[in-house]
């Protein structure tokens, strides 16, 4: 093996260090101007002033309904829902793409080497030789025009958009879980009302049957009451089917099979109504993950446009390398004095001349994509404002009719009790009794649906206001709701 002199090796290392240093110092960068600003937002929501003063919803807004079971279901959904799992994996993919794009900004360093062992025999004897070679190289594309940095920035922003999309899926999921949970409880409450109506119908039927047997009631009255009893049975059957479907939908949102999936609560009585109101419309732009996703996607498209424009300019690549070898053919190598360390430094310049308009088409495509996402961003902002206004209007409307709903039930109960008493005494007619019973059932059932609508409106408002979302809310929420999911699993096992 050949021995390399220390002074030659030192000179080689100094030259290699100088070349590598030049590569590292040649890192260029470029900044992109921000995309066009969003449309002007109103100073206040039209229906916001009608609500009591309150703050924006927090990220655990669902806890405001006061249901431990709902908290457990939310934890299960965030952990096990398949759509949210897919969204999380898309974030991981986007992060990996961002790391790949970011690597192009930095110099590439590689090492290459090989070794060959030769052995042979002849009349003079046998011998063997070891030939080895090692080289360290570094290359860097000087980013004069900012193409690599713009590409990396676009990938980074794309990862941010994926996070906002994941959080949009999570917010939609939480709203869906709460809504379906309330639907199950409301249907059970309506079932309870339907059972009570059937029981009342049966009692009236027995009274009509007795009067018919006594020759007081007519066959028409008896047939009408029997029809009312059958109708009450049909309503119960229909509501039971709807309750089963709602439970199955809720199980799907939780990532659970519908078999043996149970909901403990039986009605809406244990739920509270959280106080929710909107802040300034301008704040909504940073509180809705779908709006943030649209904005981040727009910025990513702007960075892609900058990269497409930069691709039309020359590329300058710097390469430096140094290597050491041990010759396997001494007879040849010995004829070349000073064989040992070697080094090189190369600068390459590439300029597209004629590519049939490919680069220009890529630039035009990126420009059109930016304009498309700008329109999407504006549409997302307008849609978010409309969502809030509609939700606020619905809540305000339901607040206004609460007294009417309660009064309708109270007066219907009073009317039915009076009609029933008069009929039993023989001073009232059957049609009045039958109509008052139908009115009472309709009023109670309508009030149960009103309570559901009120809860669903609050869920919609929380979603429209962003559900307490901010840039770091998702990670915090996941950490806080995990114990509830584990508690549910422990209770179920």
Describe these PLM feature segments.
Residues 30-180, 316-320, 325, 340-342, ...:
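Short flexible linkers and secondary-structure junctions
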């Amino acid at each position: 093996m050949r021995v390399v002199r220390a002074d030659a090796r030192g000179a080689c290392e100094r030259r290699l260090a100088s070349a590598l240093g030049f590569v590292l110092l040649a890192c260029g960068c470029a900044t992109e101007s921000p995309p066009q600003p969003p449309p002007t937002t109103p100073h206040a929501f039209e229906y916001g002033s009608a609500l009591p003063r309150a703050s924006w919803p927090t990220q655990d807004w669902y806890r405001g309904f006061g249901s431990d079971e709902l908290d457990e279901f939310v934890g299960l959904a965030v952990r096990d829902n398949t759509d949210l799992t897919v969204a999380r994996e898309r974030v991981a993919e986007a992060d990996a793409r961002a790391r790949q794009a970011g690597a192009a900004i930095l110099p590439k360093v590689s090492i290459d080497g090989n070794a060959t062992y030769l052995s042979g025999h002849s009349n003079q004897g046998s011998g063997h030789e070891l030939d080895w070679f090692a080289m360290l190289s570094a290359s860097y594309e000087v980013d004069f025009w900012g193409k690599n940095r713009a590409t990396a920035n676009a990938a980074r922003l794309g990862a941010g958009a994926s996070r906002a999309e994941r959080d949009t899926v999570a917010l939609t999921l939480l709203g869906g879980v709460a809504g379906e949970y309330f639907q199950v409880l409301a249907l059970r409450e309506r079932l309870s009302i339907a059972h009570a109506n059937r029981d009342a119908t049966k009692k009236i039927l027995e009274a009509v049957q007795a009067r018919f047997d006594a020759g007081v009631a007519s066959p028409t009255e008896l047939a009408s009451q029997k029809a009312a009893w059958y109708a009450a049975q049909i309503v119960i059957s229909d509501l039971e089917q709807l309750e089963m479907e709602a439970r199955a939908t809720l199980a799907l949102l939780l990532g659970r099979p519908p078999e043996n999936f149970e909901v403990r609560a039986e009605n809406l009585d244990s739920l509270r109504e959280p106080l929710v109101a909107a802040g300034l419309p301008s704040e909504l732009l940073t509180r809705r993950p779908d709006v943030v996703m649209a904005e981040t996607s727009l910025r990513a498209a702007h960075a892609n446009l900058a990269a497409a424009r930069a691709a039309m300019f020359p590329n300058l690549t710097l390469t430096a390398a140094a290597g050491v070898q041990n010759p396997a053919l001494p007879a040849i190598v010995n004829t070349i004095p000073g064989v040992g360390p070697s080094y090189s430094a190369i600068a390459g310049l590439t300029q597209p001349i004629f590519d049939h308009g490919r680069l220009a088409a890529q630039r035009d495509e990126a420009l059109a994509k930016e304009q498309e996402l700008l329109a999407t961003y504006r549409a997302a902002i307008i849609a978010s404002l409309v969502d809030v206004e509609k939700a606020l209007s619905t809540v305000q409307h339901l607040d206004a009719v609460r007294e009417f709903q309660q009064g309708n039930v109270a007066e219907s109960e009073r009317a039915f009790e009076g009609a029933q008493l008069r009929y039993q005494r023989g001073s009232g007619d059957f049609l009045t009794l039958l109509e008052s019973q139908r009115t009472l059932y309709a009023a109670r059932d309508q009030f149960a649906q009103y309570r559901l609508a009120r809860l669903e409106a609050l869920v919609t408002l929380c979603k429209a206001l962003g559900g307490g979302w901010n840039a770091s809310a998702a990670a915090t929420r996941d950490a806080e709701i995990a114990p509830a999911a584990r508690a549910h699993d422990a209770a179920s096992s």
